[in-house]
């Protein structure tokens, strides 16, 4: 069917049914509805493709709205005719409180970077040496500056969308991604013999849309968003899909990473992108070039760099991929990146502006950071109004004054940085930046350790630090207390309920329910999450305490070596240095932390509250390895969080939603109808609480 068919059919339906967006569509009989509903879906899909992918609409917005409204009215009248790939299902009214974690079928790895022609020639040389081939064909395409996503299609249907996460596991944001009209809800992969397919992509916001959003925010006296990438990433993680649909998001796909059956994987990257393009996805196909040698690659990268400012979207470089997919296994991967692809990074953008003032912020461990307030300047489509000056030494080295004209640069398209001062433009009333001697938050005297560059506030009760410490203690890698983010931490601190991390474990339901933002359910959820966090173990507690230089890896080594927090408290610096990767600075920092009486008091209060301060193994056994559990309803034996910990200690994983990866749905009292219905539809085994407990007992 060609364009003329779709255009003529649209006009025919508009005329036959007298459709208009400001009129109620006619109510059809079910027989009439069945006859026309698939035609309407095909028409809307076609017009979405013309508008969002090709940017070449062939009907007016009013005509589009009219046929969309007609389809919606039919589905409202006959809900049994709704299908998962219907275009009306892009927006769900459900508001999620959390995003379940999902494992990517293929890891979402980073790319190694190249910055000049010599780097690109070295990449070409390595590819030829590893492959044993004299001639290599490359695909070169823009490197979009957005939020990474993976899309999963099964039997032609879009069944799951996820964020990049840590590369192995991301967050399930399917409902939000369904609102993006450049993501087809159905694509005819079965025509290519493909049953299951995972695609990589990027969610972006065009420069003009980003500029308009920020202009509207500033008109309402709201702070502008920092850059399109952060706004796109934040948008796909909004809790309400109805809010996501209001954002001007575009999704582009640029890589097929997994296919079943595997022998139906396209033979070339160029062929894979063309297939996606032909199936209605927005891809880099029209901007992609097939290059016969590395000189053609270099020439195309330079050409695209020269036109980057005229592009409607932000790019920070080009991606070069070996075209022959059969070479990918042979070329292999490093620990973090494929050897068959590389990114060519463009030179950073620069602009000049004036330093209006300098303020001093207090970090979680007390570091004082000078932040320059700038005369707003546009740099690569982003308005820059502030920039970190890092520390006192940086200010002295650059000889930065208030009212100086400075050259700033956006490295990697995101982080603004002061490159130099234009000293010839320094006005007579320019003032040197005076570093404070006392904390701007609590007034305590600042200290600087020998050999270090940072001035620090060492008052553990400093208000600016306390809120950040609470947030860090509750973070995912620490105690993982769901619902205790920065806003709630600030609320609890302002209400004088939590002045110290140990206070978290003495909160009561009655304390929370009287606060703004807390209803009975959210208050109980937080109390349950706090209770569940008590069993996280020593490594997570150590990391959560926020000891300077003690990250999660070091915390795990300390826990593994000492087993109990009181052994660490008693350890000497010399003892601590016996542990791998712990040197003088880290050992001294640990001793200083445990040498403060208020920190010892905090640990005692954590212990009295029942927080486990001994080492726990991540999994007691692997009897349930490979299984995934989902819980619905109320369990009488324990909270859901505790139940999750029980199965995870036996090697299983958990999720908040039922998918084809689910092994068991554990059903408690008053279960959710949606999870039960989906489990039944997918053939997932459901078990009662009693069966669940027997399964745990048998697995110990």
Curated annotation (Swiss-Prot):
Record-level GO cellular component terms: cytosol
Keywords associated with the record: DNA damage, DNA repair, DNA replication, Ligase, Magnesium, Manganese, Metal-binding, NAD, Zinc
Record flagged with keyword Ubl conjugation: no
InterPro entries documented for this protein: BRCT_dom, BRCT_dom_sf, DisA/LigA_HHH, DNA_ligase, DNAligase_adenylation, DNAligase_N, Hlx-hairpin-Hlx_DNA-bd_motif, NA-bd_OB-fold
Family assignment from sequence similarity: Belongs to the NAD-dependent DNA ligase family. LigA subfamily.
Protein name per Swiss-Prot or TrEMBL: DNA ligase
Catalytic activities: NAD(+) + (deoxyribonucleotide)n-3'-hydroxyl + 5'-phospho-(deoxyribonucleotide)m = (deoxyribonucleotide)n+m + AMP + beta-nicotinamide D-nucleotide
One GO molecular-function entry: metal ion binding
Residues binding NAD(+), per UniProt: 61-65, 110-111, 141, 164, 202, 321, 345
Enzyme class, UniProt record, top EC level: ligase
Cofactor field: Mg(2+); Mn(2+)
Species this protein is from: Hydrogenobaculum sp. (strain Y04AAS1)
CDD domains: BRCT_DNA_ligase_like (cd17748), LIGANc (cd00114)
Catalytic site: 143 (n6-amp-lysine intermediate)
Binding residue positions for Zn(2+): 439, 442, 457, 462
């Amino acid at each position: 069917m060609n364009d003329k068919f779709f255009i003529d059919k649209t006009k025919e339906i508009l005329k036959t049914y007298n459709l208009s967006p400001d009129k109620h569509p006619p109510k059809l009989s079910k027989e009439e509805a069945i006859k026309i509903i698939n035609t309407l879906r095909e028409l809307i899909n076609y017009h979405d493709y013309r508008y969002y992918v090709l940017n070449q609409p062939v009907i007016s917005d009013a005509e589009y709205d009219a046929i969309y409204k007609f389809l919606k009215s039919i589905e409202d009248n006959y809900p049994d005719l709704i299908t998962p790939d219907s275009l009306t299902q892009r927006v769900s009214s459900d508001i999620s409180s959390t995003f379940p974690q999902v494992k990517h079928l293929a890891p979402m790895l980073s790319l190694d970077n190249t910055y000049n022609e010599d780097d690109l020639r070295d990449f070409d040389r390595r590819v030829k040496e590893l492959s044993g081939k004299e001639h290599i064909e490359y695909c070169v395409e823009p490197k979009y500056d957005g939020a990474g996503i993976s899309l999963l299609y099964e039997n032609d249907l879009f069944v799951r969308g996820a964020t990049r996460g840590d590369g192995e596991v991301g967050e399930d944001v399917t409902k939000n991604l369904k609102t993006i009209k450049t993501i087809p809800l159905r694509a005819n992969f079965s025509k290519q013999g493909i049953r299951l397919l995972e695609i990589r992509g990027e969610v972006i916001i065009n420069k003009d849309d980003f500029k308009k959003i920020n202009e509207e925010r500033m008109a309402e006296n709201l702070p502008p968003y920092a850059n399109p990438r952060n706004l796109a990433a934040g948008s796909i993680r909004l809790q309400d899909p109805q809010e996501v649909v209001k954002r001007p998001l575009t999704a582009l796909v640029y890589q097929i990473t997994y296919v079943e059956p595997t022998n139906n994987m396209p033979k070339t990257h160029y062929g894979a992108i063309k297939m996606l393009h032909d199936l209605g996805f927005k891809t880099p196909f029209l901007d992609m070039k097939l290059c016969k040698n590395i000189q053609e690659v270099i020439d195309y990268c330079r050409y695209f760099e020269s036109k980057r400012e005229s592009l409607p979207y932000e790019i920070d470089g080009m991606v070069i991929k070996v075209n022959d997919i059969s070479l990918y296994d042979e070329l292999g991967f490093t620990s973090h990146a494929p050897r068959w692809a590389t990114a060519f990074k463009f030179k950073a953008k620069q602009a000049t502006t004036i330093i209006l003032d300098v303020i001093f912020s207090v970090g979680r461990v007390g570091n004082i950071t000078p932040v320059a307030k700038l005369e707003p300047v546009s740099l690569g489509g982003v308005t820059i109004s502030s920039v970190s000056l890092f520390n006192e030494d940086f200010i002295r080295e650059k000889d930065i004054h208030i009212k100086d004209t400075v050259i700033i640069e956006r490295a990697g398209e995101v982080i603004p940085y002061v490159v130099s001062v234009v000293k010839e433009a320094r006005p007579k009333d320019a003032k040197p930046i005076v570093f404070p001697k006392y904390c701007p938050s609590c007034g305590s005297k600042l200290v600087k350790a020998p050999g270090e560059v940072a001035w620090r506030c060492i008052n553990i009760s400093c208000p600016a630090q306390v809120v950040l410490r609470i947030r860090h203690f509750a973070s995912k890698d620490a105690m993982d207390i769901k619902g205790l983010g920065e806003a709630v931490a600030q609320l609890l601190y302002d209400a004088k309920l939590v002045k110290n991390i140990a206070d978290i474990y003495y909160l009561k339901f009655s304390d929370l329910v009287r606060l703004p933002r807390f209803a009975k359910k959210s208050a109980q959820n937080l109390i349950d999450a706090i209770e569940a966090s008590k069993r996280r173990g020593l490594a997570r507690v150590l990391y959560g305490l926020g000891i300077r230089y003690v990250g999660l890896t070091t915390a795990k080594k300390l826990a593994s070596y000492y087993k109990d927090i009181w052994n660490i408290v008693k350890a000497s610096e010399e003892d601590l240095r016996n542990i791998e990767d712990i040197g003088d600075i880290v050992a001294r920092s640990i001793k200083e932390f445990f040498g403060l009486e208020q920190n010892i008091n905090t640990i005692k209060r954590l212990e009295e509250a029942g927080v486990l301060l001994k080492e726990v193994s991540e999994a007691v056994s692997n009897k349930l390895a490979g299984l995934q559990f989902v819980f619905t309803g109320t369990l009488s034996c324990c909270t859901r969080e505790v139940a999750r910990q029980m199965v995870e200690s036996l090697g299983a994983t958990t999720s908040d939603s039922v998918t084809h990866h689910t092994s068991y749905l554990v059903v408690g009292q008053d279960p959710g109808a949606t999870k039960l219905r989906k489990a039944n539809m997918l053939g997932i085994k459901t078990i009662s609480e009693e069966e669940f407990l027997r399964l745990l007992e048998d697995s110990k």
